């Protein structure tokens, strides 16, 4: 399991999104409020953003977010219109390595998977960045295309009825997300939109997304449809 968050809007620093909120990913790495599976997220973290040329950049680690002084020192200076970050709680038996931490990428999209799926139902692919289930799910989604995200998640969910398949993806101008077994909330701000596993503050504007839904964010417009 993990906790993830994404931003699409006016330029925002990674510190402002990930480290500074009173219940942001930094706090969620050791004291999440809404996490249904696992007690903390200390098995790695990752942050990705799109630079001014639209190139996806990533920083991933297999260490707890709270112990990364280097990231804390540069995060205030890293600003982007589109950011995706996650903290990881590794499934028992899965490797703990930087390549197992989200966000995964195909060069155009950044993607995080919050959940669990039986790797036996997933097609084997050499494109996966790690042997963990999340990396294989990401590779499958990339191969099918993000426009088919809803159909892909519904198919995997049918193959593994116990799967939890909360996906969060970003390409610099669009956010996509699914709810399938875990929580997701949305916050509309005057300068952009946040999608997050759980609210990172007590702003009354947060709204919960129902389970088994697809979320599509473009140009500050949020469309939510059933899966």
Swiss-Prot record:
PANTHER family: GAMMA-GLUTAMYL-HERCYNYLCYSTEINE SULFOXIDE HYDROLASE (PTHR43187:SF2), GLUTAMINE AMIDOTRANSFERASE DUG3-RELATED (PTHR43187). Catalyzes the hydrolysis of the gamma-glutamyl amide bond of hercynyl-gamma-L-glutamyl-L-cysteine sulfoxide to produce hercynylcysteine sulfoxide, a step in the biosynthesis pathway of ergothioneine. It catalyses: gamma-L-glutamyl-hercynylcysteine S-oxide + H2O = S-(hercyn-2-yl)-L-cysteine S-oxide + L-glutamate. Signal peptide: none annotated. GO terms for molecular function: hydrolase activity, acting on carbon-nitrogen (but not peptide) bonds, in linear amides. GO terms for biological process: ergothioneine biosynthesis from histidine via gamma-glutamyl-hercynylcysteine sulfoxide. Pathway: Amino-acid biosynthesis; ergothioneine biosynthesis. It holds the Pfam family GATase_4. The keyword Hydrolase applies. The active site is at residue 2. Its EC number is 3.5.1.118. The keyword Amino-acid biosynthesis does not apply. This is Gamma-glutamyl-hercynylcysteine sulfoxide hydrolase. Keywords: Glutamine amidotransferase, Hydrolase. Residues 2-227 form the Glutamine amidotransferase type-2 domain.
């Amino acid at each position: 399991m993990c906790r993830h968050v994404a931003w699409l809007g006016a330029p925002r620093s990674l510190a402002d999104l990930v480290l500074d909120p009173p219940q942001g990913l930094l706090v969620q790495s050791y004291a999440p409020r809404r996490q249904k599976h696992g007690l903390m997220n200390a098995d790695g973290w990752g942050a990705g953003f799109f630079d001014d040329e639209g190139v996806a950049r990533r920083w991933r680690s297999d260490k707890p977010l709270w112990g990364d002084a280097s990231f804390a020192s540069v995060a205030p200076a890293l600003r982007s219109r589109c950011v995706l970050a996650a903290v990881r709680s590794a499934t028992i038996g899965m490797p703990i390595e930087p390549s197992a931490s989200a966000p995964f990428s195909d060069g155009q999209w950044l993607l995080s998977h919050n959940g669990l799926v039986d790797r036996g139902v997933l097609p084997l692919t050499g494109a996966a960045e790690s042997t963990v289930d999340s990396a294989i799910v990401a590779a499958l989604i990339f191969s099918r295309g993000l426009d088919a995200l809803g159909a892909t998640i519904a198919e995997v969910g049918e193959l593994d009825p116990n799967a939890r398949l909360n996906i969060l993806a970003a390409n610099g101008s669009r956010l996509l997300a699914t709810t399938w077994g875990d929580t997701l909330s949305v916050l509309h701000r005057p300068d952009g939109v946040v999608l997050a596993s759980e609210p990172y503050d007590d702003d009354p504007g947060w709204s919960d997304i129902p389970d088994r839904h697809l979320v599509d964010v473009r140009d500050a417009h949020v469309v939510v449809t059933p899966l």
